[in-house]
C-alpha cells in the first residue's frame, strides 16, 4: 500500500509541474503504477487528467518512446478515467499521434483496438494520425489505421509519392 503522505503530496506538483503519477508513468514500471491502484478514488482521480508544465497528461507521457509497459500503463490509466483521445496542450497530439510520430507500430495497433479511440482527431497543425504516418512514409501505421477504419483522406501533402503509390 502506498504511504498516506505520498498521496497527500501527490496533488502538489514538483518544479516540472509533475505529480506522482506523471513521474511513475515516465520513470516507473507497471508495478510502481499498480501500487496506486487501491488508492485512486474520486477524491484524487483528477491526478490522471492533470497536465504537467509541458502540457502533457499521463497518457501522453506513457506514449513516448523508451517508456516501459506503455500498453499496460495506458490500460490502467483508462481504468482510472484517463482520456485515450486526450490532446496535449502544446501541439494537440493524442497518444495515437505520438505513436505515429515515433513509428511505434505495437502501440498504434493496441490503441486502434481500444473502444472509443478516435482515429480522425486533428492536432493543432491540422494533422490526423494517418497524415503523420504519411509524412513519415510509414506504410505499416497507415495500413493499421486503414484496417481499423481510420480517416485516410489526404488533403494536402508535399510528398508526390503519396499520390502515385498503390496501397
UniProtKB/Swiss-Prot annotation:
GO-annotated biological processes: cellular response to tumor necrosis factor; symbiont-mediated suppression of host NF-kappaB cascade
Gene3D superfamilies registered for this protein in UniProt: Ankyrin repeat-containing domain (1.25.40.20)
Keywords of this entry: ANK repeat, Host-virus interaction, Inhibition of host NF-kappa-B by virus, Repeat
Annotated PROSITE patterns: ANK_REP_REGION (PS50297)
ANK repeats: 54-86, 91-121, 125-154
Recorded family membership: Belongs to the polydnaviridae I-Kappa-B-like protein family.
Record function comment: Suppresses the host immune response through NF-kappa-B inactivation. Possesses ankyrin repeat domains required for NF-kappa-B binding but lacks the regulatory regions required for dissociation from NF-kappa-B and degradation. Therefore, prevents host NF-kappa-B release and subsequent activation.
Protein name listed in UniProt: I-Kappa-B like protein I1
Gene transcribed to yield this protein: I1
Amino acid at each position: 500500500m502506498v504511504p498516506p503522505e505520498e498521496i497527500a503530496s501527490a496533488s502538489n506538483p514538483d518544479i516540472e509541474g509533475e505529480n506522482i503519477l506523471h513521474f511513475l508513468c515516465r520513470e516507473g514500471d507497471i508495478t510502481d503504477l499498480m501500487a496506486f491502484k487501491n488508492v485512486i478514488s474520486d477524491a484524487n482521480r483528477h491526478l490522471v487528467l492533470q497536465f504537467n508544465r509541458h502540457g502533457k497528461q499521463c497518457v501522453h507521457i506513457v506514449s513516448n518512446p523508451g517508456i516501459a509497459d506503455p500498453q499496460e500503463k495506458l490500460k490502467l490509466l483508462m481504468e482510472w478515467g484517463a482520456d485515450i483521445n486526450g490532446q496535449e496542450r502544446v501541439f494537440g497530439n493524442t497518444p495515437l499521434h505520438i505513436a505515429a510520430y515515433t513509428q511505434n507500430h505495437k502501440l498504434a495497433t493496441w490503441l486502434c483496438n481500444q473502444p472509443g479511440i478516435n482515429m480522425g482527431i486533428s492536432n493543432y497543425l491540422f494533422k490526423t494520425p494517418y497524415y503523420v504516418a504519411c509524412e513519415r512514409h510509414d506504410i505499416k501505421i497507415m495500413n493499421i489505421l486503414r484496417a481499423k477504419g481510420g480517416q485516410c483522406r489526404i488533403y494536402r501533402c508535399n510528398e508526390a509519392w503519396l499520390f502515385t503509390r498503390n496501397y
